[in-house]
Amino acid sequence: MASTIERKTLEANEEPVDEVLQMPPSLLTCGGCQQSIGDRFFLKAIEQYWHEDCLSCDLCGCRLGEVGRRLYYKLGRKLCRRDYLRLFGQDGLCASCEKRIRAFEMTMRVRDKVYHLECFKCAACQKHFCVGDRYLLINSDIVCEQDIFEWTKLNGSIV
């Protein structure tokens, strides 16, 4: 389950009081190092407060408090997206090369077919597709707009 990370800031002109617990921040304890939090910036995740450097993935150690990062919490472990998918994601097979797609790999999906990024290319001319390119899915083969006529002539009907 993905969790949100709340970033808290204490402004110099504000009373240093936590909004939720009504406690002075110096009485807050970090969920990681168990030390008092006296920093101006701190995080709240998994119902605990954290120093920015203490909230990290339990497996790879990457910082989870950075902007754009997601925190996944499962079976008592704090995980980054990559490690969460590696442990709990589902693997599958590429519709083109039929090799394993690991759960953390980037993929392209067309209907019920899944492809490695490097396999998502025209079956006729081998050109990789860009955003906005038009193509046709014929069985598990992807054919670019320019090659559709030639492909169907050589390989039979579209349907």
From Swiss-Prot:
Transcription factor that acts synergistically with tal1/scl in primitive and definitive hematopoiesis, and in endothelial development. Specifies mesodermal precursors to a hemangioblast cell fate. Hemangioblasts are bipotential precursors of blood and endothelium, and in the absence of hematopoietic induction cues such as gata1, tal1/scl-lmo2-induced haemangioblasts differentiate into endothelial cells. This is Rhombotin-2. GO terms for cellular component: nucleus; protein-containing complex. Residues 28-90, 92-154 form the LIM zinc-binding domain. It is found in: Nucleus. One of its GO terms (molecular function) is metal ion binding. InterPro entries: LMO_RBTN_TF, Znf_LIM. It comes from Danio rerio (Zebrafish). During embryogenesis, expressed in hematopoietic and endothelial precursors, including the two stripes of posterior and anterior lateral plate mesoderm at the 1-somite stage that give rise to the primitive blood. Its main location: nucleus. GO terms for biological process: blood vessel development; blood vessel endothelial cell migration; embryonic hemopoiesis; endothelial cell proliferation; erythrocyte development; erythrocyte differentiation; fin regeneration; hemopoiesis. The lineage of its organism: Eukaryota, Metazoa, Chordata, Craniata, Vertebrata. The keyword Transmembrane does not apply. It holds the Pfam family LIM. Keywords: Developmental protein, LIM domain, Metal-binding, Nucleus, Repeat, Zinc. Induction: By ets transcription factors including ets1.
